[in-house]
Amino acid sequence: MNHFNLKLIKRIQNDLIKYNLLKPKKSILIAISGGQDSIVLLKILSILQIQWKWKLSIIYCDHQWNIYSKNQAFHLYKVSFQMGIPFYHGVTIKPLRTEKSARIWRYSVFQRIASISKFNVIVTAHSSTDRVETFLYNLFRGTGVQGLQSLTWKKNIQFEILPNFARSKKSFDLKILSLESKNGIQTYSDYNKLQLIRPLLNITRTELGKFCSNENLPLWPDLTNYNLSIIRNRIRYQTMPYLKIYFNCNLEKILAQIAEILYSENLYFENLSKKIMLKISFEEINSKKLSLSLFKILPLALQRRIIKFFFENHFSKILDFRDIEEIRYYILNLSNNSKFL
């Protein structure tokens, strides 16, 4: 292996330690597509596996978006067989017409496999370039700081609660440790620990391409990535090249740095908001209350975060900017005699 590839592996290993992404002796599920980035990720993790003593497995999610997807899955099966790594293949049975529906379906596949096969970590091959493209995608769509931080190093995957398979006699792994909720619905402890990890966020797509070329890795490019009807692909092949040529050739590096800064700052404000929530909110029988006097003296940025956090955690309701502002104005205009919301 040449010097460039060794140096790249060292950088990734340093990021694993720096951001506390992966630990030794973990069972890791690697989500791959067969393209350059995911195959490089698979190769690097298989090299580091010797030192970190991981148990690796591969998952390929077939969205049925092109006629060659079955051939792509067979190619990946052969790769996994040659490497001696277990292979999982998920195939959708319903049309997936949007990126959001595809992501929800993928996460449901991750959920089932993680539950049955006892995985706590799923690793994806999102690169620094993907992070920049997602930054622009969210910016064009309209978002706040949390959206602009783009792809993050690690993310807890949230799932819908599943039915009680033991009571319904449906087929499932009944040996999984479970928790019983008040309404008779069963949820599984493994799900709460499931994390999505992105160890390549400091590596550009160009660097991954060079590694791939040096190692002569077996690729099967995903044809969906070239479909310009998909917004992300237009950003990749049209918007980014235009911005680099006419505005700043180092734009990718600059936007990646901004995303990393926003990630760190958002993490700080999230932790601060949680600590404040413990001070100004409390629960009574069948109710959750918020101290208005303490809320009103908070800075504007924290007021918005507290409202968002309060409704998400107590009522499982996702608020947009307009909702948050309406609630905030309502609270601020309440009489000073009102102590709680």
Swiss-Prot record:
Bridged cysteine pairs (disulfide): none
Location of this chain's protein in the cell: Plastid, Chloroplast
Keyword Ligase: yes
GO cellular component: chloroplast
Domain of life: Eukaryota
Amino-acid positions noted as binding ATP in the UniProt annotation, renumbered to this chain: 33-38
Catalytic activity entry: cytidine(34) in tRNA(Ile2) + L-lysine + ATP = lysidine(34) in tRNA(Ile2) + AMP + diphosphate + H(+)
InterPro entries given in the database record: Rossmann-like_a/b/a_fold, TilS/TtcA_N, tRNA_Ile_lys_synt, tRNA_Ile_lys_synt_N
E.C. numbers: 6.3.4.19
Enzyme class per UniProt: ligase
Molecular function (Gene Ontology), one example: ATP binding
Chief localisation class: plastid
BP GO terms, sorted: tRNA modification
Keywords assigned: ATP-binding, Chloroplast, Ligase, Nucleotide-binding, Plastid, tRNA processing
Function: Ligates lysine onto the cytidine present at position 34 of the AUA codon-specific tRNA(Ile) that contains the anticodon CAU, in an ATP-dependent manner. Cytidine is converted to lysidine, thus changing the amino acid specificity of the tRNA from methionine to isoleucine.
Family from the record: Belongs to the tRNA(Ile)-lysidine synthase family.
Domain notes: The N-terminal region contains the highly conserved SGGXDS motif, predicted to be a P-loop motif involved in ATP binding.
Protein name: tRNA(Ile)-lysidine synthase, chloroplastic
Gene assigned in the entry: tilS
